[in-house]
């Protein structure tokens, strides 16, 4: 029970116990995501092209991909804006930024160096800098 670290706990125990284990070298991108900052960084690496992924939206300007019109908003690359995203007037998106499908961003909100997970809502006038925002689950009443 408790926290177990592969590098500090598991691998040394295997070596001490003379238990055979194997590794495999890959020539591809790898990031051992262990916290929110590493999750953000991995997503931004993909956004910048360090990882081969299907972007899911057409490039509308250099470094900006969007599946929705960007009328009345300011977007600085790199940025990915998913399908069915609603952007209020005067929204400012300063990359790196990723807005997942179905996000709603209120008028005048500012997003910088952040990720909105699918379905997230950001109220009007909100500043989100260096974060990850998601959708709150529906509360279940017992």
Predicted regions and their residues:
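Catalytic-core segments of class I nucleotidyltransferases/pyrophosphorylases
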Residues: 1-54
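A structural motif detector for beta-strand N-caps
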Residues: 57-73, 79, 85-91, 97, ...
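A generic, residue-level signal for flexible/boundary positions that often mark functional hotspots
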Residues: 15, 20, 27, 75, ...
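Alpha-helix N-cap/loop-to-helix boundary motif
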Residues: 31-34, 77, 95
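Extended, intrinsically disordered, low-complexity segments
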Residues: 138-142
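Histidine- and/or cysteine-centered catalytic micro-motif in compact active-site loops
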Residues: 26-27, 44-45, 84, 90, ...
């Amino acid at each position: 029970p408790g926290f177990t670290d592969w590098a500090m706990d598991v691998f040394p125990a295997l070596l001490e116990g003379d238990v055979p284990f194997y590794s495999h070298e890959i020539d591809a991108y790898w990031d051992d995501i262990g916290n929110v900052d590493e999750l953000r960084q991995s997503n931004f690496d993909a956004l910048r092209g360090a990882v081969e992924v299907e972007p899911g939206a057409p490039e509308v300007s250099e470094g900006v991909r969007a599946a929705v019109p960007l009328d009345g908003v300011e977007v600085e690359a790199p940025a990915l804006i998913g399908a069915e995203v609603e952007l209020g007037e005067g929204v400012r998106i300063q990359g790196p930024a990723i807005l997942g499908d179905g996000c709603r961003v209120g008028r005048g909100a500012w997003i910088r160096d952040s990720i909105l997970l699918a379905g997230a809502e950001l109220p009007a006038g909100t500043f989100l800098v260096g974060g990850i925002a998601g959708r709150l689950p529906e509360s279940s009443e017992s």
